[in-house]
Amino acid sequence: MLQIEIDNGSGFCFGVTTAIKKAEEELAKGTKLYCLGDIVHNSMEVERLTKKGLITINHEQMRELHDVKVLLRAHGEPPETYELARRNNIEIIDATCPVVLALQRRIKTQYEKGRQSSYMITSKGNTTVDDPSKLRPLTGGEDTTSSSSVSLPPAVGEGQTLSASSSIVIFGKNGHAEVLGLVGQTHSHAIVIEKFEDVKALDFTHDIYLYSQTTKSLDEFHKIIDYIQRHISPDAKFQSFDTICRQVANRMPNISTFAARHDLILFVAGRKSSNGKVLFHECLSVNPNSHQVESADEIDMNWFNGVETVGICGATSTPKWLMEECRDEILRHTK
């Protein structure tokens, strides 16, 4: 008989759990509640909460709202969103993850320090930007439910830096809601690098302050740190801040062990989940017989021919009930 194990370590992280709890509490009161962007990168969970009354909006739609309640999800938001809420008399239900919130504050503090240094340099007659013509208007967004009309940060190598002598660099997914919120703390002056190869285009004659999106790969982050340390100018300062969520980082070794002990891995996660992409890649590297699905409807029963054990796991945005639903679907067809 086919043996199926659901990974105990999979499921919502603390930040997502808190956001969903806050949404459900408001909806239980009969409150009309809007959420700025998908509350979690999982279409099934979004659909469940939509049926309860949660209304998902983007930034353009928020501009048209007045005198309502809007929930900010765990990913966080840039300062402009709070200012918009103030102008439109919108009550914010802030579910920003504490880890993300702490990271936003650290980046903002570093940015303010850089501005003060920049002002001191300018007062002595020097310019604060290497080439002002390189400062371009930033437009666009990747996550259309969350970043409509929100400025994308500059890509690496475009010359947009904190000051003449320092750069705030964020290792993260360009256009991701969390990254937009982080870059917003610097008035879009931070530089975003998405992958290890991007680090090579940085200006190593500048001081570099390196941070990471909370859900990125710890191994790749360390590779970036090592590269910068080897190439930074002797006259420049380099500081890195390990801002990757430990609940996320610890999932990597745990999911590797889990994936290795089963004939087949069914990885359940929304395809928009950055964390999901990282974890599924880890499953594949350990167990090539790994398959990703968003729901039970995507399961191909032919996958289980000749298989004795199945491990079901997921991202920090995957609800436990969805993994259980996938397990039940498999059992219905394999008895």
Regions found by a protein language model. Name each.
Residues 1-117, 124-127, 161-335:
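The feature marks the mature, well-folded catalytic cores of soluble enzymes
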